[in-house]
């Protein structure tokens, strides 16, 4: 099943997956990307932003389908403007919208994409069979795509993105239109790609999907960089602690505001936002200093939704 993908090139850590330098793209009356500067490591990367944030524009620039107004972009260490063909040969692309010929079989479509990537016809057909098996379409590969469900069409699009043995696969909203089971199955497939030496850049507005399968997050909003970082570190340094000190909640919140720590009192419980473990130690010291009874102290990691909203809100504040 996975023999062909196991032969993918080894992952090299010398060059980042993406290197953007003041990357800007303007259309008449609209700045789609605004001086993005960031290095993104290899692995499974979530490209996060609301509709209109600039995700599709970035994909077009990576694929060489559009040219930046200013700045530059490197993919896998190669300048897209200098050698777009070399970049494209290392990429697979799964578009958001349905673009499959409905009268053809999945096997024929995926094999055709393999040949377009430069594979000999016989090799392409064998790879198509293996990849369709990998994505769970082995028994359906000779059926016309017109009879496929939404989930099966999404899997076919993923298969055509993988058949050319890419170093990086661009996934544009891969779980769009899927039911809960189909979504979980698609995310499981995305999670497996790293074991084959394939990096992933997954564009989505569903932060739960990113939190589930991505080890790095690139957040953009209105064409500007909001945050870039390892998923775990983003969540770890944005923890929230709920403290129960009985009727003294307001007194504790007032003292913590002097430190200062960000707090909110909800039904007598004090919620404290912490950036690191040192601030947790400060919280404990303040409780001891005031001599308050500590009935409960529980830690909850914030979600990526909260991280995104907090960073986006901070970015627009004067």
Protein language model features and the residues they cover:
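Helix-to-loop junction immediately C-terminal to a conserved catalytic motif
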Residues: 63
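Conserved ABC transporter NBD signature motif
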Residues: 71-82, 87
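ABC transporter nucleotide-binding domain
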Residues: 185-274
């Amino acid at each position: 099943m996975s023999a062909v993908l196991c032969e993918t090139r080894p992952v090299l850590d010398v060059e980042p997956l993406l290197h953007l330098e003041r990357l800007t793209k303007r259309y008449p009356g609209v700045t789609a990307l605004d001086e993005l500067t960031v290095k993104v490591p290899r692995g499974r990367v979530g490209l996060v932003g609301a509709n209109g944030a600039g995700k599709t524009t970035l994909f077009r620039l990576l694929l060489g389908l559009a040219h930046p107004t200013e700045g530059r972009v490197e993919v896998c260490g190669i300048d897209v403007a200098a050698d777009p063909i070399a970049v494209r040969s290392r990429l697979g692309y799964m578009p958001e919208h349905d673009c499959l010929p409905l009268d053809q079989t999945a096997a024929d479509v995926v094999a055709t994409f393999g040949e377009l990537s430069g594979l000999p016809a016989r090799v392409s057909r064998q790879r198509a069979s293996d990849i369709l098996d990998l994505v769970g379409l082995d028994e359906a590969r000779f059926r016309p795509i017109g009879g496929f469900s939404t989930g099966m069409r999404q899997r076919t699009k993923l298969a055509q993105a993988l058949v050319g043995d890419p170093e990086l696969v661009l996934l544009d909203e891969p779980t769009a239109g899927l039911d809960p089971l189909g979504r979980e199955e698609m995310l499981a497939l995305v999670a497996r790609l790293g074991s084959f030496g394939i990096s992933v850049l997954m564009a989505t507005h569903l932060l739960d999907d990113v939190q589930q399968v991505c080890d790095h997050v690139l957040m953009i909003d209105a064409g500007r960089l909001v945050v870039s970082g390892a998923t775990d570190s983003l969540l770890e340094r944005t923890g929230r602690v709920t403290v129960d000190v009985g009727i003294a909640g307001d007194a504790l919140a007032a003292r913590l505001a002097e430190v200062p720590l960000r707090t909110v009192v909800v039904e007598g419980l004090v919620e404290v936002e912490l950036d690191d473990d040192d601030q947790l130690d400060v919280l404990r010291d303040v409780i001891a200093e005031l001599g308050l009874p500590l009935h409960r102290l529980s830690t909850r990691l914030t979600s990526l939704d909260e991280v995104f909203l907090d960073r986006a809100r901070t970015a627009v504040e004067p």
